[in-house]
C-alpha cells in the first residue's frame, strides 16, 4: 500500500489538521452546513469576485461555495487558501489590523494569532498544501474537529465500496475488471471516529489491507503510529507501532476497531 494510505496529524489545542489522502474530499457532505461565503486569502488564479474594500476575492452563496470546494477537492495540490465567513456586512467592518492578519495568513502556513476571526465568525480556515518531508499534505483548521473525522468516515466507506465494486477477473486472459453495482457502505460510528481522532494527536497512518487477512466477508484497514512524518512505504509496517485494526463486516454491515 505504498501510495495508497491516509496520514493524519492533529493538534487538539488549535484544532488544526494536517492530512494526506483526505484534504477536502467529502467536505461538503460531512459538514452540517456548507459555509455561506469564502474569503480567498491566497488566490493565485484570481478566482471569485473582487471586493474593493478589503482587496480580497470572495465566493458568495451556499451553492457557489459548494461548487468551489468540490472542485478544489479534486486537485492533487491546492494553492488557494480561504477562510469562511457568515455575513458580508460584518466582513466589510474588518479593521486594518485584521486585514493585515489575513494577509499574513495568506502568505504563511500559520496564523499570526488565532485562525478564528470574531467579525467573520469562521468555522474553517483552509491553509492549502504544505510540504513536510516533501510530501504534499493539506493543512486546515476546524472549529469542530469532528467535522474532519466525518470526512474521514466518508473516505473510508468509499474505499470499501469501491473495492467491492471491482470484481477481479477469474482467469488471467480476462484482463478487464468487471464493475459490480453495490450498496454504498455506511461510515464508521461516532465512537470509532472519536477514537481515531484521539490516536491522531500522535500522528497516524491508515492503510487499506482489503480482504487479505480477514476473509472475503470483511475488509480491513490498519492504523499505525506515524508521528509528524507523512512518508510511509510498505517496509515501514514492520517498523511502526500498530495501533489497531479497523474492519468492516459485509454480513452485518458494521464497523469494528480492535487495538
Give short role names for the model-derived ranges.
Residues 1-259:
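Structured alpha/beta or helical-core interaction and ligand-binding surfaces enriched in interleaved
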Amino acid at each position: 500500500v505504498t501510495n495508497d494510505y491516509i496520514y493524519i496529524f492533529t493538534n487538539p489545542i488549535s484544532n488544526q489538521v494536517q492530512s494526506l489522502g483526505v484534504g477536502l474530499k467529502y467536505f461538503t457532505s460531512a459538514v452540517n452546513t456548507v459555509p455561506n461565503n469564502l474569503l480567498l486569502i491566497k488566490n493565485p488564479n484570481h478566482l471569485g469576485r473582487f471586493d474593493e474594500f478589503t482587496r480580497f476575492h470572495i465566493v458568495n452563496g451556499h451553492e457557489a461555495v459548494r461548487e468551489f470546494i468540490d472542485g478544489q477537492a479534486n486537485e492533487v495540490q491546492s494553492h488557494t487558501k480561504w477562510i469562511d465567513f457568515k455575513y458580508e456586512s460584518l466582513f466589510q467592518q474588518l479593521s486594518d489590523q485584521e486585514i493585515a492578519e489575513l494577509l499574513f495568513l495568506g502568505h504563511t502556513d500559520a496564523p499570526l494569532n488565532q485562525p478564528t476571526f470574531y467579525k467573520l465568525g469562521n468555522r474553517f480556515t483552509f491553509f492549502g498544501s504544505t510540504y513536510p518531508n516533501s510530501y504534499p499534505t493539506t493543512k486546515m483548521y476546524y472549529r469542530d474537529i469532528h467535522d474532519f473525522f466525518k470526512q474521514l468516515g466518508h473516505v473510508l466507506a468509499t474505499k470499501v465500496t469501491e473495492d467491492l465494486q471491482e470484481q477481479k477477473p477469474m482467469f488471467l486472459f480476462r484482463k478487464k475488471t468487471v464493475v459490480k453495482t453495490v450498496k454504498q457502505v455506511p461510515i464508521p460510528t461516532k465512537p470509532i471516529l472519536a477514537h481515531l481522532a484521539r490516536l491522531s494527536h500522535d500522528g497516524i497512518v491508515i492503510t487499506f489491507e482489503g480482504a487479505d487477512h480477514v476473509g472475503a466477508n470483511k475488509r480491513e484497514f490498519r492504523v499505525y503510529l506515524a508521528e509528524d512524518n507523512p512518508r510511509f512505504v510498505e517496509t515501514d509496517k514492520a517498523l511502526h507501532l500498530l495501533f489497531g485494526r479497523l474492519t468492516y463486516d459485509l454480513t452485518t454491515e458494521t464497523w469494528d476497531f480492535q487495538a
